[in-house]
Structures are given as C-alpha cells and as structure tokens.
C-alpha cells in the first residue's frame, strides 16, 4: 500500500464517490467536509451526499443516457448507486430514494472505510499533494477566491445561464434554413423563421408560462448581465424582435423576404448532433418550457436534451483547464469532480467523482490515469466537458447526443438508443478492474 494520502475536498455526491474509489484501491484518503462547522445556504444536515433538491436520480432504464451511466457505475462498484439502489422508493421507471436513508447510507459506507479519515473543517486554500476538489455549486467564498486565482478570472463562473439544447434529428429541416447574419463567414446557424402571427402566439405563451421560484441565494443572478428570455419578453413584445429574435440580415432563401422574427440554433457539439437555442437562457419550468419551445417553427417535435436553466452554480471552464481524466492541465496531481467541472445532475456528478477518484488512486500508485472512451456514458461526459467549445461552455446532463456516433445510422430512436446502451456497457466491462 502506498503511504501517500489523497485529499478530497467536499463530501457531496462527487467527493463521497471519489473518496470511496480511492480508498478501495488501497490508498489513504483525507476527506474534508466543512459541514456542520460551516453550513451552506442549501444544506440542512452534516451527512455526506445530501440531496438538496429532488430525491430522484432520474431514469433507471437503458433507453435513457442517465440510465446507462447508472448501469456503468453499478459495474464499476459506485458507492452512490449502491446506496441509491438500497434506499430506493417507488418511482416508476426512475430511481428515487429516501433522501435521509440515502445520505446516512453513503456516510456509513465512506466514513467506515478503514482508509478514510474525515476532517470536519473548511478548506480555504488548495492543498499541496494529490487532491480532488469536489466542493460543488455552493463552494465557500474563500475557496472560490482561491480557485478563481488558480484558474484565472475568465475561466471561473458563479452561475449557469444555459439555453435549451435540442437533437438535430428532431428538427424539421423543411421549415428552417442555414444562414449566418448578412452571410458573414460560413453559414453557421439554423434559422427558424416566424410570421407576425406565429410570433404573437409564441410571445403570449412565453409571458404566461410558469417560472421556477428563485431561492434566496440565487436572487443576484440576473444582475450579472444575463437576462432570461421571459424577463426580456415581459418588457414588451418588441424587446425580443430587437434582441435575440431579430431578423435583420436573415432573409429566408425560400421567399427572399425577411421574416418577422427569427429564432437561431447554433451547433453545440463537434459531431453536429446537438443545437442550442441562441439567447434563450430561461427560468421557465420544464413542462411549460417544452410547450413554448415547440411553438417555434421547425421545433414542433423537438427532442430537448437539456432544458434552459439559470441558477447559482460554481463551475470552471473545463475545456480550457481539464483533461478527460479530470486532471488539471497545469498540475497533474490536482483533480476536479462534480458540478464544478460542468457536469449537470446528481448522477453525472457522482460519475465524475468515480473517474477522478480512480485516476487519483492510479496516479499515487504510479499507474497511468484512464480515459474512458466516448462510446461510454461516463466517457462521453468527460469528453464533452474537456473537448467542447470553450467559448460557449455551459454545464450539461448525460444524453445520447454526446456519445460517439454509431458506425451504422439507425433511424428509429428506440433502436438507436438501445444500440448506444449495448455498445456502452460492452465497452465499460473492459474497465471494471482498473
């Protein structure tokens, strides 16, 4: 057994998973958790992996990418998924848990491991030596300042302002056209043209749609210079036509005329399978959000892989800063995990902790860190956060649009998803003993 100790900062979903993966590989872990010495605005207990929002870990079937990532994690002996399975409550095709039992179970498994030492204190400086930073979206101000200094001000963010993302295959290409404004540069946007009547219907639905209530600690977000589309709309219908939906320079090649309004879609991934809706960061609830977006011509049947969100979230610009091993590019023994890396969601956070933990253990044992291939769900997430366009980087959930394309195109969605899942699980089995 190596005598080197790995510091893990934060005992949330990612930190707990990372600590467990390091410890089970025979490496000593010093797990720092500032609760209960110092609480966050969202936590209520001193337990590890406390779920601060929903008690659902989302879909549990292999027809959904988050179901595939769970199954990969089961095969890799994830402590988070094991605890979730043991504390599950009825939820149809989803994996939901008794949140108190779940947190208690994770705490028990991690705390009682002989290679884990828990230290209840706030870390305000990044330690020397092998370290995994997994402090989550509510990282304390002092450590945030240190991370900002480490990564550079331009690469450290305090909130999400993410527009919705749709699958290209679900866009009605007969209703949209490829064009850049005034034909500058290459045609880079798919444009959804609207008549005045279509815009009016969209506008009325948008201003009437239900929004997510803001938590107290999130209320400063909108003063940071990034306005939700529904707030812009509430200032008057022309605000959108002169803002994110302005049609000037975007004549419709089918008619030769300028539409009344245009919604632009921008490619979001290297493979060209995902498109984001430009300027549509929003605080709408997901149900109403889908109804409003499907009023946009060409998006009537859009498959939304990530809904627009705006919430408090401390995260780094991973494409500029991290390798797909979750290592910091400027310091081999420093790893990041969890929502801080730009993965979005409980399961995705734990999955990043699993891989960061494995690689931290391998590093101190003198072994090569592992990069999971993007045909796997975990590998596709690591690839997305480290290889996507750094300029427009925003956090992302697991979805099949991030997976490496299938060798053979499959038209039916259910069969295509099944093929993604089968290939992912066949591949991950080669890594279960790393």
Swiss-Prot record:
UniProt-listed Enzyme Commission number(s): 2.1.1.74
Gene3D superfamilies (alphabetical): FAD/NAD(P)-binding domain
Gene Ontology terms: biological process: tRNA methylation; tRNA wobble uridine modification
PANTHER family cross-referenced by the UniProt entry: GLUCOSE INHIBITED DIVISION PROTEIN A, METHYLENETETRAHYDROFOLATE--TRNA-(URACIL-5-)-METHYLTRANSFERASE TRMFO
Binding positions for FAD per the UniProt entry: 10-15
Reaction equations catalysed: uridine(54) in tRNA + (6R)-5,10-methylene-5,6,7,8-tetrahydrofolate + NADH + H(+) = 5-methyluridine(54) in tRNA + (6S)-5,6,7,8-tetrahydrofolate + NAD(+); uridine(54) in tRNA + (6R)-5,10-methylene-5,6,7,8-tetrahydrofolate + NADPH + H(+) = 5-methyluridine(54) in tRNA + (6S)-5,6,7,8-tetrahydrofolate + NADP(+)
Subcellular location field: Cytoplasm
Swiss-Prot/TrEMBL cofactor(s): FAD
Superkingdom, natural source: Bacteria
PROSITE patterns associated with the record: GIDA_2
Gene Ontology molecular function, alphabetical: flavin adenine dinucleotide binding; tRNA (uracil(54)-C5)-methyltransferase activity, 5,10-methylenetetrahydrofolate-dependent
Keyword list, A-Z: Cytoplasm, FAD, Flavoprotein, Methyltransferase, NAD, NADP, Transferase, tRNA processing
One CC-aspect GO term: cytosol
The species this protein was found in: Bacillus cereus (strain AH187)
Protein name: Methylenetetrahydrofolate--tRNA-(uracil-5-)-methyltransferase TrmFO
Classification of source organism: Bacteria, Bacillati, Bacillota, Bacilli, Bacillales
Its job: Catalyzes the folate-dependent formation of 5-methyl-uridine at position 54 (M-5-U54) in all tRNAs.
Principal location: cytoplasm
Family: Belongs to the MnmG family. TrmFO subfamily.
Electron transport among keywords: no
Keyword Membrane: no
């Amino acid at each position: 057994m190596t005598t080197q100790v790995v510091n893990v900062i934060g005992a949330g979903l990612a930190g707990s998973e990372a600590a467990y993966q390091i410890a089970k590989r025979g490496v000593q872990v010093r797990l720092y958790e500032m609760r209960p010495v110092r609480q966050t605005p969202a936590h209520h207990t001193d337990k590890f992996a406390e779920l601060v929002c929903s008690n659902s870990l989302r879909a549990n079937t292999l027809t959904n990418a988050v179901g595939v990532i769970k199954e990969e994690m089961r095969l890799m002996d994830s402590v988070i998924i094991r605890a979730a399975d043991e504390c599950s409550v009825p939820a149809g095709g989803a994996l939901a848990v008794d949140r108190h039992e779940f947190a208690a179970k994770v705490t028990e498994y991690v705390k009682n491991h002989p290679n884990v030492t828990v230290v209840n204190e706030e870390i305000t400086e990044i330690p020397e030596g092998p370290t995994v930073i997994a402090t989550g979206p509510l990282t304390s101000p002092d450590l945030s300042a240190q991370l900002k200094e480490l990564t550079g001000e331009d690469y450290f963010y305090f909130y999400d302002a993410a527009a919705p993302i749709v699958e290209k295959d679900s866009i009605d290409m007969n209703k949209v056209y490829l064009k850049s404004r005034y034909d500058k540069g290459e045609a880079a946007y798919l444009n959804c043209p609207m008549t005045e009547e279509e815009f009016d219907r969209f506008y009325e639905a948008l201003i009437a749609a239900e929004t997510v209530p803001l938590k107290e600690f999130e209320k400063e977000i909108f003063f940071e210079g990034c306005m939700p589309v529904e707030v812009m709309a509430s200032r008057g219908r022309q605000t959108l036509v002169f803002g994110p939906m302005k049609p000037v320079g975007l004549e419709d090649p089918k008619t030769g005329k300028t539409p009344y309004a245009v919604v632009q879609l921008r490619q979001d991934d290297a493979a060209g399978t995902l498109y984001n809706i430009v300027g549509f960061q929003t605080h709408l609830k997901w149900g109403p959000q889908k109804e409003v977006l499907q009023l946009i011509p060409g998006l009537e049947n859009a498959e939304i892989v990530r809904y627009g969100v705006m919430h408090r979230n401390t995260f780094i610009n991973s494409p500029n800063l991290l390798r797909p091993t979750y290592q910091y590019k400027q310091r081999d023994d420093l790893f990041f995990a969890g929502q801080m890396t730009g993965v979005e969601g409980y399961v995705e956070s734990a999955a990043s902790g699993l891989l960061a933990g494995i690689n931290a253990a391998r590093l101190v044992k003198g072994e090569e860190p592992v990069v999971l291939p993007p045909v796997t769900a975990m590998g596709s997430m690591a690839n997305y956060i480290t290889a996507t366009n750094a300029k427009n980087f925003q956090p992302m959930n697991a979805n099949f649009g991030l997976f490496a394309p299938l060798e053979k195109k499959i038209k039916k969605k259910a069969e295509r998803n099944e093929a993604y899942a089968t290939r992912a699980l066949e591949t991950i089995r080669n890594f279960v003993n790393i």
